[in-house]
Amino acid sequence: MSAAAVDAANAAPLSGSKEMSLEEPKKMTREDWRKKKELEEQRKLGNAPAEVDEEGKDINPHIPQYISSVPWYIDPSKRPTLKHQRPQPEKQKQYSSSGEWYKRGVKENSITTKYRKGACENCGAMTHKKKDCFERPRRVGAKFTGTNIAPDEHVQPQLMFDYDGKRDRWNGYNPEEHMKIVEEYAKVDLAKRTLKAQKLQEELASGKLVEQANSPKHQWGEEEPNSQTEKDHNSEDEDEDKYADDIDMPGQNFDSKRRITVRNLRIREDIAKYLRNLDPNSAYYDPKTRAMRENPYANAGKNPDEVSYAGDNFVRYTGDTISMAQTQLFAWEAYDKGSEVHLQADPTKLELLYKSFKVKKEDFKEQQKESILEKYGGQEHLDAPPAELLLAQTEDYVEYSRHGTVIKGQERAVACSKYEEDVKINNHTHIWGSYWKEGRWGYKCCHSFFKYSYCTGEAGKEIANSEECIINDATGEESVKKPQTLMEIHQEKLKEEKKKKKKKKRKHRKSSSESDDEEKKHEKLKKALNAEEARLLHVKEIMQIDERKRPYNSIYETREPTEEEMEAYRMKRQRPDDPMASFLGQ
């Protein structure tokens, strides 16, 4: 194909005509394809300069080929470019600038005296036609008379703003309009000053100010300090009353006598939820819903009943939550037994069915109770007085003094215990259980831990304290040391250096000793597991005994558990939420 034919093809419009003859892309040889790929790799590695489009911009070599390649029907020259991927200017919307706005109060142009071609035939204005004219239809239009031609109206521009332009509240605002308000306030202030000056002139002419200056109170400084300010306020009260109606706004209380504005704001002395516990590992605060479900004082050891805020989880158990859960449980049970009820689909039907079920259940219990009483008797035991009367505990009002004596009402009788009280045996002055130490009960008078022992008095206390001192001295001898001399310090340093050398020699022997340590740990863990099993059996036996017949001793120990005991406790602990918990006993 000749060069003239190619130029003619490029100059022809891309309208799909049959006369258009474009050169089709030729098939590349293997050598050309290999060179092209090598050049692309070099450009990606930065060893070769990137391609440049017709605008002089670099083309990123990492852009895929299906994006960077130009279709042959768009650009037959196959020049490297990304113009076809950018927004086309003819498709972009043209928005108005931020300074453009509708013109207000535009003066009308001078009235013309001659009809202009293309103007309204009725009034003669150039801005509209006869069918859009708002004037009264004339008997003979301005086109034929040439008189009373109306001026041209101002045509407002068609503004089209972008996202920010539509939300610009100050667009089109003229700051000079605010000067009118400033001038009005300045006039009011000037009028008040002139009135005040006139009053002072009148008082000076009448002699009131001279009498006030010559008064003894004014000379000795005994005049009330607020008298002058009160006069100033009283002189301005008349002016303030004029504007009191304008100043009265919702959410405010305006007092013209005191000239103050009091805000009706709610006192916020409560603490924000997220400031109650600054520990990041404490209860989570959701800023979107402003909710803190858990108790922020959970890790602080405080009782939830004593704190002012214990989390938002209490809302889950308020209102109709419990009743709704009971209704849902009844719906599930009824569905399992063949009743077609659903809480969300048929709420009214389910509510009526649940109410009738509760009534029938109560009737069935009453019938069952009556049948048992008729068959076996025992109605007289059910007619016994309540437990409050039996234990002499009532809700009668009783008023006490500061010293504990009864002022009004009858003193309440003390509830008697089922156990014997104030029983002192074997010459003891205190009862058994008045002393507690290291998991054992005893007598407070002699610190004895044997229930049926004789009281030894202060001598027993001294013996117990001396035993503690001996134990404490044995443990504290190591901590209390005499001051050392320089020679002793030097000898200790030499010993430490020898120990370090020995440790270096024994490093290669540690591998053999590690196996021995593992065996020892295994044996300790085995013993701890056996002890934990024995403890669980002991606890199980105690729980099977009646609560009133259980012994007084406690399982509590004061010493800290070892690592093996803690590991055994974790291994033997049963978790109710564990799905495999039922298989542990097998």
Curated annotation (Swiss-Prot):
Residue ranges with Basic residues bias: 498-510
Record-listed cross-link Glycyl lysine isopeptide (Lys-Gly) (interchain with G-Cter in SUMO2), residues: 349, 408
Bias (Basic and acidic residues): 20-44, 529-550, 557-578
Location(s), subcellular: Nucleus; Nucleus speckle; Cytoplasm
Primary role: Required for pre-mRNA splicing as component of the spliceosome. Participates in the second catalytic step of pre-mRNA splicing, when the free hydroxyl group of exon I attacks the 3'-splice site to generate spliced mRNA and the excised lariat intron. Required for holding exon 1 properly in the spliceosome and for correct AG identification when more than one possible AG exists in 3'-splicing site region. May be involved in the activation of proximal AG. Probably also involved in alternative splicing regulation.
Domain of life: Eukaryota
Phosphoserine: residues carrying this PTM: 215, 227, 235
Record bears the keyword Nucleus: yes
Motif Bipartite nuclear localization signal: chain residues: 129-169
Main location: nucleus
Location of the region described as Disordered in the Swiss-Prot/TrEMBL record: 1-103, 206-254, 491-586
InterPro entries linked: Slu7_dom, Splicing_factor_SLU7
Subunit (UniProt): Component of pre-catalytic, catalytic and post-catalytic spliceosomes. Associates with the spliceosome prior to recognition of the 3'-splice site for step II, probably during catalysis of step I.
Family: Belongs to the SLU7 family.
Name the UniProt record assigns to this protein: Pre-mRNA-splicing factor SLU7
Extent of Acidic residues compositional bias: 235-248
